[in-house]
Design a protein with these regions (language model features):
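Positively charged n-region of N-terminal signal peptides that target proteins for export
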Residues: 1-4
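Sec/Tat signal peptide C-region and signal peptidase I cleavage site
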Residues: 19-25
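Bacterial N-terminal signal peptides
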Residues: 7-18
Length: 230
């Protein structure tokens, strides 16, 4: 899996730059230039991944589009408000960290049990969040768990990629078809989500700060350790 510290930090930084604009332009600019194109790119990348899996579900064929989908997710993974929160989608897309290896154990159990009901998009959507999404696929693309049951692993990759694409498209549609307007119309009569423009701006800042803290404390901080316990 190829991830860099720079790519993890740049996405929240893009939101910071947008929110540093004049007060009347910051929220619209963030929505128009960061969030909407970011989720559109993620939906497109996951759709490409699912399309590839439908014709060739081998790890070798799927690693490049999986990496592209992961890169696209990093651009929006810190924006959890609205459609990404619904149904726990963000957690199902990227359940990490998983210190107890819940996802790994569940994946092994699925490969051993080979339940045909699970290798459909509908079946995959009912799985635990620990076994779904980008990290569920990573185990089937880079680990040796698939050796237990290669044919079932292939079908499971197809189901998980289709499930991932469905979640990405639902989030994109949720922003385009309503939630973007909810954010942009903050303070307007009838907007019960954000009672003022300041509330919407604060919500985006909160997402930004949470994303930066997660990168610093978990993605970077955990591998580095502390001065006393490196």
């Amino acid at each position: 899996m190829r991830r860099t510290a720079l790519s993890l930090v740049l996405a929240p930084a893009a939101v910071a730059l947008a929110l540093a604009a004049p007060a009347r332009a910051d929220v619209p600019e963030t929505v128009a230039k960061v969030i909407l194109p970011g989720y559109a790119g993620f939906a497109r990348a996951t759709r490409d991944l699912a399309t590839t899996a439908a014709t060739d579900c081998t790890p070798e064929a799927l690693r490049a589009p999986w990496n592209a989908a992961f890169d696209a997710w990093l651009g929006v993974q810190h924006v959890h408000i609205g459609p990404a929160e619904e149904g726990g989608r963000a957690l199902a897309i990227a359940f990490w960290p998983d210190p107890k290896n819940i996802g790994g154990r569940q994946t092994e159990a699925m490969l051993q049990g080979a339940d045909p009901a699970l290798v459909t998009p509908e079946g995959a959507a009912q799985l635990s969040v620990a076994a779904r999404g980008l990290f569920g696929l990573e185990r089937l693309l880079y680990g040796d768990a698939s050796d237990t049951n290669p044919a079932y692993a292939c079908a499971l990759r197809r189901a998980l990629t289709a499930d991932l694409a469905a979640m990405a498209q639902a989030i994109e549609a949720g922003w385009k078809d309503g939630f973007a307007d909810t954010v942009l119309s903050a303070g307007s009569p009838g907007n019960t989500t954000y009672l003022s423009a300041a509330e919407a701006r604060q919500a985006l800042f909160t997402q930004l700060i949470a994303g930066l803290e997660f990168n610093a404390d978990t993605r970077i901080g955990r591998p580095l350790g502390s001065f006393d316990h490196p």
